[in-house]
Amino acid sequence: MILLDGKSLAEKIKNQIKQEIDQLTQKGYRQPVLSVILVGENPASQIYVNKKIKDCASVGIKSKPFFLPENITQTELLELIGDLNGDEEVDGILVQLPLPSHINTLEIIEAINPYKDVDGFHPINVGKLATGRNDAILPCTPYGIMKLLHEYNIDHFGKDVVVVGASNIVGKPMSLLFLKDEKSTVTICHKNTKDLKSHTLKADILVVAVGKPKLITEDMVKEGAVVIDVGINRVDGKIVGDVDFENVKKKAYAITPVPGGVGPMTVAMLLYNTLEIYKRKLIEI
């Protein structure tokens, strides 16, 4: 069984990013700049944002955080995004999700300049991904998963891929990446899928992203499958995934741990996207 170590690969990617930024700044170019917007005081979101700010600093990306009150209006938030869209010194914009219930999340995402959309959530970037365009900014978690598979020489050509979870953040874009260039046969499962086990047992590559601890058990995975666990759940004070890791690993060819698998890759690809957006602007100068 191969343990897909996202933590070590993420460090490798971050080191490469740091080296590239160091080379650019030594030539007189400014640092890349990422604006991070957090609305409210959700403890988990605060942890994620602070981690992103810390990781930005570690590679030489300048972060420009905005910590906004829970009761900010839709109009006020849109005005801030408009200002950041027009700021030539800002390369990337990230709005930490989830947003408070009174904020229209889709409208906020659509307000971000698609060329500054480091999360890859804007409909233009999603459309580019869906149509196979190579200039799409890719969502960080699915992109990180593809990088992880590539690092371990796991090819998905001709494979049966099953994605459990149909969110806009992971499930849907993940499916589109596997479909790109007609490489894989992809099945998406969701809350209305009948007999989930019958689908997961067919998977050469199984990606699970639903937020239900140990949803996927050993009897739901075929021998020799590659299992990617995106879930992050807190159970009895411990972080666990959506897969029953200890039992499923007995059957898997390769599997991601939780923590230390997909999570670090998501942050690494956020930094990667920020650098790529910055470099695109340099080419235009």
Swiss-Prot record:
Pathway where this protein functions: One-carbon metabolism; tetrahydrofolate interconversion
Keyword Heme included in the entry's annotation: no
One GO process term, biological-process aspect: L-histidine biosynthetic process
EC number assigned by the record: 1.5.1.5, 3.5.4.9
Keyword annotations from UniProtKB, A to Z: Amino-acid biosynthesis, Histidine biosynthesis, Hydrolase, Methionine biosynthesis, Multifunctional enzyme, NADP, One-carbon metabolism, Oxidoreductase, Purine biosynthesis
Alphabetized Pfam families for the sequence: THF_DHG_CYH (PF00763), THF_DHG_CYH_C (PF02882)
GO cellular component: cytosol
GO molecular function: methenyltetrahydrofolate cyclohydrolase activity; methylenetetrahydrofolate dehydrogenase (NADP+) activity
Subunit and partners: Homodimer.
Protein's recorded name: Bifunctional protein FolD
Source species: Sulfurihydrogenibium sp. (strain YO3AOP1)
Lineage summary: Bacteria, Pseudomonadati, Aquificota, Aquificia, Aquificales
